[in-house]
């Protein structure tokens, strides 16, 4: 496939800094943003809103094909705003109900295919930053501008620990580290769309470098690949 507009893919494991870098890149370049990790949760919430049964593959597929969702940047302190049918659902989609429902809708092959097409439709002028786990390998494999962010499991656990502590949650860092390692193993070894860098991706290890340096590396790569101002 070929994209209708410039696309930058940002893949990698949880906690590597994808979300932060994707938001900063979208703001710096004036590009649209796709948070693919939220897509299934958004679809699940849309199904709940429209009284679509979570075992109705045909209805879910139709809903997925016309999913009215936007990812809005511009408030770095609050992160990306997820808007479904004009309503801010950034907090709602993180509920356990949405999480459980997302797992159910993701089980249907036709729903996954419809959401794949829907994600590709985000590639519109002036450009797109696509944040996910298989953006460069499955969703936008032909874009020349691919980034893969990674960091040690220990560093990612520490970042997650700090985030949860800041939000008032009482968490155990050893448990977080164990969960991250288990998810890494599951994601990297699954048979469908495993978490691996695209062959032509720029791999950035964010373990020991600050966000400004990561951003500089990313912008330089994008400038070289897409010929856009860095």
Swiss-Prot record:
Keywords, alphabetical: ATP-binding, Cytoplasm, Kinase, Nucleotide-binding, Transferase
EC number, UniProt record: 2.7.4.25
CDD domains: CMPK (cd02020)
Ranges in a coiled coil: none
Gene3D superfamilies xrefs: P-loop containing nucleotide triphosphate hydrolases (3.40.50.300)
Top-level taxon of origin: Bacteria
Catalytic activity: CMP + ATP = CDP + ADP; dCMP + ATP = dCDP + ADP
A GO-annotated cellular component: cytosol
Enzymatic class: transferase
Subcellular location, record wording: Cytoplasm
GO process annotations (BP): nucleobase-containing small molecule interconversion; pyrimidine nucleotide metabolic process
One MF annotation (Gene Ontology) recorded for this entry: CMP kinase activity
Stored Pfam families: Cytidylate_kin
UniProt binding sites for ATP: 12-20
UniProt similarity note: Belongs to the cytidylate kinase family. Type 1 subfamily.
Protein name: Cytidylate kinase
Source organism: Shewanella pealeana (strain ATCC 700345 / ANG-SQ1)
Gene name per UniProt: cmk
